[in-house]
Amino acid sequence: MGNPKAFLTIPRKEAGYRPIHDRILDFSEVEQTLNSNDRRQQASRCMDCGVPFCHWACPLGNKAPEWNDALYKGDWELAYRLLNSTNDFPEFTGRICPALCEKACVLNLMDHEPTTNREDECAIVEHAFSEDYVHVEIPERNGKTVAVIGAGPAGLVAANQLNHKGYKVTVFEARENAGGLLRYGIPNFKLNKSIIDRRLRLLEEEGIEFRYNRQIDVTKLPEGFDAYVVSTGTPTARDLKIPGRELKGVYFALELLSQQNRILAGMEFSKDELVTCKGKDVLVIGGGDTGSDCIGTAHRQGCKSVTQIEIMPKPVEGPEDPKNPWPNWPRTLKTTSSHEEGCTRRWNINSLEFLGKNGKLTGVKVQPIDWKPNPEGGRPLMVEAGEPEIIKAEAVFLAMGFLKPQQPEFAENVFVAGDAASGASLVVRAMASGRKIAAQVDKFLNK
């Protein structure tokens, strides 16, 4: 390593976010960037670990020590080549990955100041695009064809990998554009959609064909292809079937997030179709990242207030989780940029009933609860803790995850990738699955 003692003298420095009073007025990306000198200094903190646990923790097996060292030495092109050797689209993970690698960093064990791998990754790939290190590479064709059903992260990675192996790849997408949850679920303030469009232009120039607005029944796959990759994600959100569910004002989280992203892309919706938080008391049910995205979107739409409730207990505060120690992912309290913008957060809250008047939502009846050990083992028991109460709300967003799809029995030339195989997970895991499945397809077609 270029500077094996840098971690002893250089503290961790994050780029941070734009000021709250500025960022809530638009949907531009909230995260800022460091200058190149500061970025190289941060890369120098990556120590010459005997065992690089960052590599172990990353589903893609990213070579963080190698590209951090190249970045520190100022060899941005080598850093990009090393990064791109394991990660097809680092411009996505560099923005939205939770950075499993950083939690597994040896420096995180020592002083809770791990290397800034995610930010370094984003800086490397953006520098690569600006300096034209990212080239169109049209491979020699091998005469075989592959259909990819679904243009989310897993499908795009599989298509990219197979295209570079010489296959003629056609991607079928049910919606009007590619990206899956990258485009229709993740807000622009975390991932500007121009970043996706830039990559799609490159994929098209390299020979991948995209067919949009094509809803494909996976039991009736289009004919004429040598192999198929099914990467349709997890389209079914978990519902909350309690009294009052039919009231106007109760929505799935993606109804808000997807529509807002489409509006920013130039689509128009009628007043009756519009899902808006403007001037409303908003309640988000579900404590994960999707719920957090709803909070940030609600602020930008001009909500009156936002409350987020979660049925599970409050996670451990602080950097360590005694029940899930390093180098595993710590199940600790996460405060996002959206939470920083203003939000009442509550845990151990069970929703009982949606309340309304004249068919419109006015509030939610909830019950504070506790979780007690189950004497028979297994899942803890939920018990009431106090009296029911009513949370005022004119808009509720259900952000409770997604149901794992049940796939039919497929022929031997059909492969399932990403969330369609595993159930809802991280974008980085879907991308890793896309690479794995592409290798399996290649092996199958060459046996």
Predicted regions and their residues:
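Residues forming the flavin
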Residues: 1-37, 42, 121-447
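Ferredoxin-type iron-sulfur electron-transfer modules in oxidoreductases and energy-metabolism complexes
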Residues: 24-42, 63-95, 111-138
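Glycine-rich phosphate/pyrophosphate-binding beta-alpha loops
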Residues: 45-51, 88, 421-427
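Iron-sulfur cluster-binding cysteine motifs and their immediate structural context
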Residues: 48-73, 93-124, 170, 174-177, ...
